[in-house]
Amino acid sequence: MTEDTKIGGASGRFPATHWSAVLAARSDDPAERSRALEAIAAAYWKPIYKYVRIRWGKSNEDAKDLTQDFFAKLFEKEYLDDFDPAKARLRTFLRICADRFVANEAKAAKRLKRGGGATHASLDFDAAENELQRADHDMQLAASSESMDDFLEKEFIRSLFGIAVDKLRSECESRGKLIHFRLFEIYDLEADGARKTSYAELAKEFQIAPTDVTNHLAFARREFRRIALDCLREMTASEDEFRREARALLGVVPE
């Protein structure tokens, strides 16, 4: 994305959000806990799948099984009961748990059946594998824990942005503003390594005024920033953690 479409935008203002999936995942309310675990699985299944492929050198099919089985444990409320947000970030905790899980599964003779109630989240493993291959990672890399933390962080950001893009598309469509999303998609998401389409060219393609291109893109960028920050807020346990993560991951400076 170009400089003016960074997640912080011109002001880097924070949205007013109140719900944390990290905290709700340990709720006594089954519906609240299920909602939280769905959100965590949606944000982290793809990073964990890629992590298992690279860190443990697992095949595509084995990584699918392990990822679904791992998140089944989260839905059974076994792992997150031990998570202390004051001591570690969620992704670090999940990485450690995933390492233990894969190591234990390697020793176990019994494998949980794939898809056996592991999660209701939609897991598009083919898309995840395609992303992994395009990134050209060294599948034989014997990476250190520190470098794997960095890898997981980058994949979490990628996953969060993907979720935000999907939500923006859905919101724009429901509000009759799909053209706003299409302009954002073409100008900000599809221009890597290619000549960027000009505002005048977009105006001609969509048969609108150049000023409308400017206004529609400003709307889409603002909404994308809001949605991405909302998604990040759900994955943190406190306002302080949210603000730290926003600065570190998204380049947002709180006012």
Please identify what each model-predicted range represents.
Residues 1-255:
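Intrinsic, short, N-terminal disordered tails of RNA polymerase sigma-factor systems
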